[in-house]
Amino acid sequence: MFKNQFYIIIIVLAVVLLGSCKGFNHIQKKGTPQEKYDASMKYYEKGDYYHAIQLFDELIVLFRGTEKIERIYYYYARSYYKEKDYILASYHFKYFAKTFPRSPFAQESLYLSAYCKYLDSPKFSLDQTSTKAAVRDMQMFINMYPNSPKVEEANKVIDELRLKLIRKDFNAAKQYLKTQYFYAAIYSLNQHIKDYPSSPYKEECAFLIIKANYVYATKSIFSKQEERFNNAKTAYNDYMTKYPDGRYVKDANKLLHNSNKGLAKIERFRNRRYRAL
């Protein structure tokens, strides 16, 4: 019994799907521009964005220069948005806002263009080109519509995206230290502090600069060690000035102690050489 019911359901669905395809094909091939317009809106309202997009593609050409083109293009962009094709949706929303700046949909379209880039932004470990574009476009929206009710949400999106960029930059700097590219690590950690003054990783960066300079000194040739141990001490003083009660004070003190030991060893070696002369 249940098996028969299952087959009946399959047959009914197949008939409905076939009828739907026939209806679409008929409209697409033989429908008038107005019939295609009406059908595209019905497909959109039903949530059939795939077929709506195909008809909108034609309608953009058929209705170019008419009053209806604005509405057609807006729903064309929204169809891509609903289909979660955020790259194309962003492009078409931006094009709409530029082409129809006086439209009641222009403000929303410019926001959604940036928001689509936000939705397309990958996790922090991947390439962040779309993240940077989202920040830029969201800021452009705020500049153009400073009184929009969407400004607060836009600022939250920017903060979230910037935090992702900050995290990526910080992890890239740490990776230099992990792979023992000490000069690059020191430069990148210092640059992170300059580029991102609100970074939640600033204190850790300041500590890692001490560590990078110290380890760099221990792995350097003798003639470079004194300068690099002293660089570690300078970084220590900078850390303690900014974070006297910081999370890494104990470890920073150990690095200072070891840097002083390294400098003392260099001084003893010099004294022995001097006496030998």
Q: PLM ranges: what are they?
A:
Residues 9-17:
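Bacterial N-terminal signal peptides
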Residues 2-5, 17-277:
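Acidic, polar-rich low-complexity tracts and alpha-helical solenoid repeat scaffolds
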